[in-house]
Amino acid sequence: MSKIWEDAIKSNAWPFVEAKKILDSLNGQIPEKGYVLFETGYGPSGLPHIGTFGENARMVMVQKAFEQLSDIPTKLICFSDDMDGLRKVPSNIPNPEMVAQYMDMPLTSIPDTFGECESYGHYMNAKLRSFLDKFGFEYEFYSSTNCYKAGMFDEMLRMVLEKYDEIMELMLPTFREERKATYSPFMPICPKTGKVLQVPIEKWDAKAGTVTYKDKAGNYIEVPVTGGHCKLQWKPDFGMRWAALKVDYEMYGKDHLANARLYSEICRILGGKPPVQLCYELFLDENGEKISKSKGNSISIDDWLKYAPVESMALFMYQNPTRAKRLFFDVIPKNVDEYITFNQKYHLEEDRAKRFANPVYHIHHGNVPKIETFGITYSLLLNLTSVCNPSDKSVLWGFISKYEPKATPNTNPYLDHLAEFAIRYYNDFIKAHKSYLSPSEKHKVILQDILDMLSDIADQTEAEAIQKAIYDIGMKAGYENLRDYFKDLYQILLGQNEGPRLGTFIKLYGVQEMKKLVEGQL
């Protein structure tokens, strides 16, 4: 065994922990199909949200960790449940009243309200795929509609008929009495309307491969369960898919946890082996409510990428997948700065085991680019933007170039992008909410002390020395809690409750510019 393998197998980073579970489930052997199958799922009822991206990003982290532990080939599929009937019209799409006419129709049988693709489902699938492609995921896209209609699931659907009673015995105890009377694992597709029907099944014939139901007129309608003429209810569908595709690893949100036992048991009933599974916590919006594609109450993928690099979004996905996290615009600056810190630590670290534990290893699948920001963080750029209110990033670069003459937009493209992102974020989220504190007489004494200190120091004074001098002024002012002191300074000088380390900020902004800012409040 190589030292690299030993470090990876011992790692406590969660992608390696998951990868070890998969390897153990296989007893180190290559599956009969010749590869290990990772599956992610997507419900295209509404526009893909950031949670959809998150599942795929996390899945690839586990896939790449597995490839570090084993030379067994792997494959990732993204499965779209686009044959589901439309149950609710999303609020964040154009022409919702048009879509409302197609309730219970398969998503791939509804006209595209965006006017770009052959159906609503195809449009939603395209939105997901375009981003997965943009991020560089290597995957195969599976459409539920195509799988059912092409006969990929036919063998399993016939087996569901053969095991009908056993599956019903498993499912019925999970329902209320009213639902028990009408439930069947099969949902016929109406030959006349094309709708996905949730109707009682009057008769099922395993030999003929058909089910029979009553239409609204009381007529008995017999349809094959194969060839896309029926679809399974979502719980049996989950387990059937695991068995049909021989899935080895699946992730799902906490909303699936209560049904995970059913998925696994149905997979076993159909002769399959349930995959290793990871249940991740759901993202919450600013109000602590679950984010939803149909509500559109979340940051979209495009929203995040308007204000920050994609790596920061991947870091948010990596961190603590089994813990619920609030997902709103305020988390963006923090994740950008944490990514910068992790990136710098990774390249300073020589211990491979510690590198394996660093999130950026998994975000970049072991090929971590080296970025240089010269100690300039996203938060620092936001505060610089706050005081100089630039029309474009060239204004920020004027300060950056004085702070670090080596830095240029061409040689430091990451920093250049951060400057552009910071201006956008400031204009959209900070500018309108700035509220300045009018300085009291006590504050004016403090500001004068700061001004005197700035007048006495040279432009070459180190940031730490400036920070200590400001700290000493706060101590002298008699604050019981220096947090209150710095909060007052941020409110007076920046119009915000929070702010940067002032020593570093003054070095970036410039001593003379800072003197003008302080003088303006006296």
Curated annotation (Swiss-Prot):
Coiled coil: none annotated. InterPro entries: aa-tRNA-synth_I_codon-bd_sub2, aa-tRNA-synth_I_CS, aa_tRNA-synth_I_cd-bd_sf, Lys-tRNA-ligase, Rossmann-like_a/b/a_fold. Gene3D superfamilies: 1.10.10.350, HUPs (3.40.50.620). GO terms for cellular component: cytoplasm. Belongs to the class-I aminoacyl-tRNA synthetase family. HAMAP family: Lys_tRNA_synth_class1 (MF_00177). This is Lysine--tRNA ligase. It comes from Rickettsia africae (strain ESF-5). The gene is lysS.
